[in-house]
Swiss-Prot record:
Top EC class of this enzyme: transferase
Lineage, highest ranks first: Bacteria, Pseudomonadati, Pseudomonadota, Gammaproteobacteria, Moraxellales
Cofactor entry: Mg(2+)
Record GO biological process: coenzyme A biosynthetic process
Chief site of localization: cytoplasm
Molecular function terms, GO-annotated: ATP binding; pantetheine-phosphate adenylyltransferase activity
Family: Belongs to the bacterial CoaD family.
EC number(s) per entry: 2.7.7.3
UniProt KW keywords: ATP-binding, Coenzyme A biosynthesis, Cytoplasm, Magnesium, Nucleotide-binding, Nucleotidyltransferase, Transferase
Source organism, top-level taxon: Bacteria
Source organism per UniProt: Acinetobacter baumannii (strain AYE)
Full protein name: Phosphopantetheine adenylyltransferase
KW Transferase (keyword) present: yes
Cellular component terms per the entry's GO annotation: cytoplasm
Pathway in which this enzyme or protein is active: Cofactor biosynthesis; coenzyme A biosynthesis; CoA from (R)-pantothenate: step 4/5
Amino acid sequence: MSKTRVIYPGTFDPITNGHVDLVTRASRMFDEVVVAIAIGHHKNPLFSLEERVALAQSSLGHLSNVEFVGFDGLLVNFFKEQKATAVLRGLRAVSDFEYEFQLANMNRQLDPHFEAVFLTPSEQYSFISSTLIREIARLKGDVTKFVPQAVVEAFERKHQQGW
């Protein structure tokens, strides 16, 4: 039987405890999990791609079947390159579903083998988003219960650099 390989794509700017929860759960469901960190040109990320990959590795590196890859371009092309079984997406709210449903159908039009798997977050993470976390951190609020310690430290370094 062939191995199941799922891609969990995102900008992860920064990775949150919600992301960590989904990857941890996915690592029990799939043989291999690829955390695919998008360059994210259109989002003007706070953290560089290298920083985001390092933060993901420090937060999830203890999971032996999880790897971390930066990527650029269409997700459907990356899906094919990685010979993936499916793409994993988290759904926090109905509004997420509408967007993800449309995206999955478009990707399936581009590649009929494209499959999307949706997971809802554990309840305590259902309201967390990287955008909210960045805003709280920018205003020097306490984000320690929403992100891994490595991210807290990365925000502290950004503040020291004048962010």
